[in-house]
């Protein structure tokens, strides 16, 4: 009986160490692609602004033609990799639920290039969703190369998605919490081990390349008085209501429009 218990304990510890090691590898890969995506978006945004501010009439015509070309390229990319469209978060969730099976290479290439082209065209595209999908897809590719089990692959895809978010915003805890609340929707130490390892590794790489400053850095110049706490609670309630109305409005529009 003791021997059986020892074997189970050994297998459990071995699995935990495997997940931790693979989580570090996935976190490094996700961190690299998320940081590269963030750097490209920053450069493209700066270039677009400088070009628009100094453009002459005929240069503006050239810009319009370039936008049409960007739109055509994005259309072709979506035909090639249809799951690369949209935010990227629902797609990762559907992948983990087994509802879709995204092709790794086309999705990564289309998401990366399409996001840059969309940003160059002035579309309001954030880096959260793309970084999550890019990280998740790289984790899926790594899982296939490492020949892990289906359960381990699901954990690593979740870890890769969380690491992408962590690297995009220099926020490792936010990445882990997001994965737990929005993607995995459960709490397990087997899930937390690779997720935290991946987030920490991705964030370390992001710090090494981009510095330790947070994505949303602002100074605190005054202490909030206690009397204002009631307004903060009211603002939180109001913001929640607005979010619910907005989400239901989007769902209604998707059902109503052809």
Question: Where are the predicted features?
Answer:
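Alpha-helical transmembrane segments and immediately membrane-proximal extracytoplasmic
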Residues: 1-258
């Amino acid at each position: 009986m003791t021997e059986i218990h020892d074997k189970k304990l050994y297998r459990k510890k071995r699995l935990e160490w495997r997940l931790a090691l693979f989580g570090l590898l996935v976190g490094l890969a996700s961190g690299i692609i998320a940081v590269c995506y963030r750097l490209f978006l920053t450069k493209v945004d700066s270039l677009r602004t400088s070009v628009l501010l100094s453009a002459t009439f005929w240069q503006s015509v050239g810009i319009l033609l370039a936008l049409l070309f960007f739109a055509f390229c994005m259309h072709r990319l979506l035909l090639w990799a249809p799951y690369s469209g949209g935010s990227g978060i629902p797609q990762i969730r559907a992948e983990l639920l087994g509802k879709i099976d995204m092709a790794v290479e086309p999705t990564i290439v289309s998401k990366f290039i399409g996001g840059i082209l969309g940003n160059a065209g002035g579309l309001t595209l954030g880096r959260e969703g793309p970084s999550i999908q890019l990280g998740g897809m790289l984790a899926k590719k790594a899982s296939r190369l490492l020949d892990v089990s289906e359960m381990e692959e699901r954990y690593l895809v979740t870890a890769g998605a969380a690491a992408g978010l962590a690297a995009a915003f220099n926020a490792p805890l936010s990445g882990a919490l997001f994965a737990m609340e929005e993607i995995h929707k459960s709490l397990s130490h087997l899930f937390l081990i690779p997720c935290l390892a991946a987030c920490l590794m991705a964030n370390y790489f992001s710090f090494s390349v981009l510095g330790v400053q947070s994505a949303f850095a602002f100074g605190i110049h005054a202490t909030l008085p206690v009397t204002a706490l009631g307004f903060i609670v009211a603002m939180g309630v109001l913001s929640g209501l607005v979010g619910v109305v907005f989400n239901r409005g989007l769902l209604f529009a998707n059902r109503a429009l052809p």
